[in-house]
Amino acid sequence: MAEFPEKKDNLVIENIQPSVDANRFAIKREPGDTVKITADIFRHSHEKYDAAILYKLRSEKRFRKAPMHFVDNDMWAGEFTVNSIGYYDYKVIAWTIDPKDTPTESPLMELRVDPVYARTGTWYEMWPKSQGKDPKKSATFKDCEARLDYIADMGFDTIYLVPIHPIGVTNRKGANNALHAKTDKNGNPLEPGCPYAVGNKFGGHFAVDPELGTLKDFEHFAKAARAKGLRLALDIALNCSPDHPYAKKHPEWFYHEPDGTIKFAENPPKKYEDIYPFDYYNKNFKALWKEIRDIILFWADKGIEIFRIDNPHTKPFPFWEWLIREIKEVRPELVFLAEAFTRPKMMHRLAKEGFDMSYTYFAWREQKWEFEQYFKELTQTNAKEYMRGILFPTTPDIFPKYLANQGPAQFRQRYFLAGTLSSLTGMYNGYELCENIPSPVKEELLDSEKYQYKVHDWDSPVNIRD
């Protein structure tokens, strides 16, 4: 039997825009933005009515009111300006002049206001171990500090650091991704390994690699960077080498083979024998999730404002929604970048779940029609409400064929495109030197610093920094 209505609503409020998946996810803005809202509002008779937007920062007690006006065909529009970062709640309300009528309200909707540097920034990707002058040993944070003026003078406002933690010894990779690093006669590795294999006897995600220096050295570097107007981003690789303290202390946090051994990582077609992936739904998963939250907050306290997350598409969506909200509710100034070169719908979902920025397919776009099609998708569809794309011409994992063995003109052209197609752009260190020798077997640079110490000639005559 049909139920009688509990509320005598005489007005209909529907089709509120903008909206992300019928208000399942928040729309995103930055301080100073004007948020423009439209809604279809109508009723069954000719009685006059009015409408407004009620909005507030979630921490505020009272809603503020912004008027709406009739546009056409039952569409109403209004706007309000946001000046503080954090989560906002808003809704549309409509009412008639009849005092007996109860105002009609839409469901509460969510808006997230992120720092301006979530929308605009120029990044310089720094591999700390490659900032020195000796190809046989690691550079230090002091060497990195010596390069700050060079980076600031190029106009960058953000230094993005790859993982700075201790690197595993077991199954350590060698130069050019060789399965095993070279060792001395006692079996000690002679190569640094990959920084994404986090953890050894010196610690894990809360520690720094002793080759780079101490935690105090890092804090000094961070302070010096801030003094130069440079923000710091840190690469968070949620992987553990077999030598990571977690492997012994929390074996339940990992996947296991049928024989009980911890399972190595795979990201088909790639295999990573030097790292273990976390099992995000293990029997003690809440402790794991909280530990990862604490890693982020630890480095935020040390001066990191942006977190570039490695391979987020290989972790569960609910984890990201929980983690980013959990952190932003207490530290709304922190920003997250999704490093997910994967299927489009997967990338869009990560942005909806809360990532402030996303890597893009820019590196593989070459033809005019490809650029037009792709950037229309990012800027002229609903994606603009939740996805902010950052453009890197190259990365340590991607060296496109059109730059292979090419000269300064091609390198300038690609960076010019990156800098004009998005308000977020980045450069991998060495790009300004037009380093152009490709790997014969992969879409990467030969002799990648992912697996070896590397010395760059920052004063090379082909440097295009000017």
Model-derived features: positions:
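Alpha-amylase-like alpha-glycosidases and glucanotransferases acting on alpha-linked glucans and related
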Residues: P195-F202, F206-E219, K223, L230, ...
